[in-house]
Amino acid sequence: SSPKAFNGVYLPYWTYDAQTTSNFTGNAGYDRKVRKRDGTLETRTTWRPVSGVHQEFMDDITVMPSNRQENSGVKLCEPFKLSKLIPYDPKVLAGFVAERYSIGLKDGWAIAQTTIHEKLKSSIEDYIKFHWKCNHASGVVFSTVYSKITYKYILVPVWISSFKYKEKTYQFAVNGQTGKVGGKAPVSAWRVLLAILFFVGVIAALYYLT
């Protein structure tokens, strides 16, 4: 089965910036080699408690406030080139659907904080390994204070389509900036996949020509 017609859509995103200050505790792990009785070497890790303050600026944390497109492959075709955004111009949207957000600014910020928390956890673990010159970091617990919080409401270009294979409908999306494809495909549906790649190629060609 071939894909249905592609629909050009401008989808809404919230982006958030914030300065973060996190007080943390954790454990720094130091590896050492110990020779066993049979002559082989074994790695053992010694742990010591650590604590500190980590500061980091979070830039352009994106939240897609569109419930309608959450299963269409849009998340899988991220990221978008946010540095290429231009000021709002109705002429650019002419001929395309521009979807309105369904998740408000406040709820979007709550979602963004979940993303920020995961990024901070990884950053703090890296900070511990660098600052204490250890091999591992574990048991990180932290609390974060946010300041200088700003946001933007943006629209990003996406091509949406779907195809039917063995009585099941599969949706997918194409990033209108990069041509990256997102979505799930059935196993062994080679003709369908080739058709998708053909249409993606056409879109990419149009993008580069314009």
Which residues does each PLM region occupy?
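Charged, low-complexity helical/coil segments in non-catalytic cytosolic or luminal regions
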Residues: S1-K164
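An acidic- and aromatic-residue-enriched active-site/binding cleft used to recognize and process polar
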Residues: T21, Q177, P186
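Flexible loop/turn segments at secondary-structure boundaries
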Residues: N23-T25, K168-T169, K180, A189-W190
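Extended, hydrophilic extramembrane loops/domains of integral membrane proteins
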Residues: V156-G182
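Juxtamembrane/start-of-transmembrane alpha-helix segments at the extracytoplasmic/lumenal side
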Residues: K184-A195
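Juxtamembrane boundary at the C-terminal end of a transmembrane helix
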Residues: A204-T210
